[in-house]
């Protein structure tokens, strides 16, 4: 139940998102360096997705995320039988050369019990993949998105780019709407 969709963003749109977000790194209070990678929190759960992505450079990312969600629902309509779920947050991530999130993990845990779906949209072409323990690996390709359940059934890890290039990804979660 992994949805892989190419051409959600053009290479030019990916480059614009990378350049815009990287220029914000030094001025953005949401910038975080956790050693393996840097990330900028583009949207938190208490913020409006539409408002945070209203910037013309980020508008294609907004459209890509909505498109990926709709394509997932089209292919796996049973997700509509769940309680209401919506986007929780979006991060822009940059992995330094030779780094990756290389340990096996899933996104649903006691700290995040409401997570339903995970998504990633690759912004750069790299010679590496997101590996799934029980599913096929997904090669990175600029503009390619993937969406999958956040649960242990979709445990995954990343691998470093063998070409020694920086790697850029938009990622986030859809979670149950808690009232």
Across the structure, where does each feature detected by a protein language model lie?
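Non-heme Fe(II)/2-oxoglutarate
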Residues: 1-84
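Catalytic core of Fe(II)/2-oxoglutarate
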Residues: 104, 115, 125-179
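Beta-strand elements of modular eukaryotic interaction domains
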Residues: 81, 108-109, 159-160
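Intrinsic-disorder/low-complexity, polar/charged segments enriched in Ser/Thr/Lys/Arg/Asp/Glu/Gln
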Residues: 2-4, 116-118, 169
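Short, conserved beta-strand element in jelly-roll/cupin
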Residues: 92-97, 109-128, 174
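Histidine-centered catalytic micro-motifs
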Residues: 101-109
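Acidic, glycine-rich loop-and-strand cores that form catalytic or ligand-binding grooves
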Residues: 80-96
